[in-house]
């Protein structure tokens, strides 16, 4: 039975842009990967409903709830059973998207996926995460825990996710789970 998730942007009286600006005040982690194929193929990989089933090495199941021109919402269950809802805020056809992700009705991280065309046969995908972890802490006090613990964990995670799209494109089969090693947060 498909149950429509609740949650999303908080009802704070702020506009979507104002809430996104609040997310952008957090510490961010950026990772990028270059692919040996063009922007069109990369977009088709990252924009399909349920795409993480084939491309995400820590995904147990990725189920789309809404996936049409204006609404994109899905559920990502990790190998360890943790379940997150992804609500896409801005969908820029052929270019990328941004979304919030987190447990249903829980704290949300803000994520930006951006495609860059390098030439006809090469493109790159960058993912930038503004995690909810430490978001309510003073930036000066949260700097060391962020740099020493959270950033390395998320970088390892993002590298595996980005490489998963290349694996799927090259082998035309789902990326094996934990292919580049287990992750203590998601495996």
Regions found by a protein language model. Give the residues of each.
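Hydrophobic ligand-binding cavity/cleft-lining segments
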Residues: 2-67, 186-187
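Hydrophobic pocket/interface hotspot
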Residues: 41-46, 52, 74, 88, ...
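Short, surface-exposed coil-to-beta transition loops
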Residues: 28-30, 81-86, 107-112
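Beta-strand/loop substructures that line and gate deep hydrophobic ligand-binding cavities in soluble
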Residues: 5, 10-12, 103-160, 167, ...
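Residue-level preference for beta-strand/loop junctions
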Residues: 25-27, 68, 80, 107, ...
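Short beta-strand segments that buttress and anchor functional surface loops
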Residues: 72-79, 98-104
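Charge-rich (especially acidic), low-complexity segments
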Residues: 175-187
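Short, conserved beta-turn/loop elements at beta-strand boundaries and strand-helix junctions
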Residues: 92-96, 120
């Amino acid at each position: 039975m498909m149950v429509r998730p609740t949650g999303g942007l908080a009802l704070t009286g702020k506009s979507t842009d104002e809430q996104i600006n609040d997310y952008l005040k957090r510490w961010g982690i950026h990772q990028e990967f270059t692919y040996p194929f063009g922007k069109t193929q990369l977009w088709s990989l990252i924009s399909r409903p349920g795409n993480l089933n084939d491309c995400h090495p820590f995904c147990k199941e990725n189920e789309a709830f809404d996936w049409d021109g204006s609404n994109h919402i899905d559920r990502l269950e990790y190998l360890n059973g943790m379940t997150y809802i992804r609500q896409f805020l801005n969908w820029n056809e052929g270019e990328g998207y941004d979304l919030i992700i987190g447990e249903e009705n829980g704290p949300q991280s803000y994520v930006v996926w951006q495609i860059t065309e390098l030439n006809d046969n090469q493109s790159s995908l960058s993912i930038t995460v503004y995690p909810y972890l430490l978001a309510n802490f003073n930036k000066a006090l949260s700097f060391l825990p962020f740099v020493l613990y959270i950033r390395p964990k998320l970088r390892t995670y993002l590298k595996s996710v980005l490489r998963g799209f290349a694996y799927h494109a090259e082998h035309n089969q789902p990326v094996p789970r934990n292919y580049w090693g287990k992750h203590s947060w998601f495996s």
